[in-house]
Each structure stands twice: as structure tokens, then as C-alpha cells.
From Swiss-Prot:
One of its GO terms (molecular function) is tRNA binding. It comes from the Bacteria. With S4 and S5 plays an important role in translational accuracy. Keywords: Methylation, Ribonucleoprotein, Ribosomal protein, RNA-binding, rRNA-binding, tRNA-binding. Part of the 30S ribosomal subunit. Contacts proteins S8 and S17. May interact with IF1 in the 30S initiation complex. HAMAP family: Ribosomal_uS12_B (MF_00403_B). This is Small ribosomal subunit protein uS12. The keyword Ribonucleoprotein applies. PROSITE patterns: RIBOSOMAL_S12. Belongs to the universal ribosomal protein uS12 family. One of its GO terms (cellular component) is small ribosomal subunit. InterPro entries: NA-bd_OB-fold, Ribosomal_uS12, Ribosomal_uS12_bac.
Amino acid sequence: MATINQLVRKPRSMKVAKSNVPALDACPQKRGVCTRVYTTTPKKPNSALRKVCRVRLTNGFEVTSYIGGEGHNLQEHSVILIRGGRVKDLPGVRYHTVRGALDCSGVKDRKQGRSKYGVKKPKA
């Protein structure tokens, strides 16, 4: 335990909080260009072909971003918007692609949870 004199000389230092999404530079979203669009398999016990893309961001970072929803139109050189949010069963994937923004289309025939997939309200 430090004495009061020691604390006066050198106060206790605060812990620095480490960001889970360093590539965003404390921004809500970032724009980037797809450099590679591919599928990858999740870790045990899950099994699937998850759609992901490698993105070169405007600040120079190169990150892996998950493409949510059924079907997508992304290819190399597509300009997309990414947000934070990791995918628990894909190691190294800490960002999500924002559907319905820039070159990324919304999910076709989506009726519920539309706002998360960039889909407008259907005509009645």
C-alpha cells in the first residue's frame, strides 16, 4: 500500500481502455474498397461457408469484414461502408459490412428486421 506522500508525488495512473475496433479511429463507420471477397469456415462446433471480404479502408487499414444476410453483390473494387461488431465464430473478423449503403445492396425479399439489412418498406 502506498503512503499518502508517495501518492502526492506520483498519483495512481488510470487504466487505458483498449478499443475492440481500432481501424475505425473512433468513428461510427468507415468507407473502404473490397480487395478480396471470399467464404471461410467458422470454428468448432459450427459449420457453414461464411461470406467475408478483405477491405482497404480510407485511413490505410486493411481489415476483414463480415457480409451479413442472404446473398450479396460485392466483388473486388466494390466501395462499402463497414461498422464495428465482431463475428464470434470467425477468428479475426471484427467488422460488419453495412447493407444497403454505397455499393452494397440490401437483402432481397427481406420482410422482418429490414433496417439491419438495408431494405425499404415494401408497398402494401
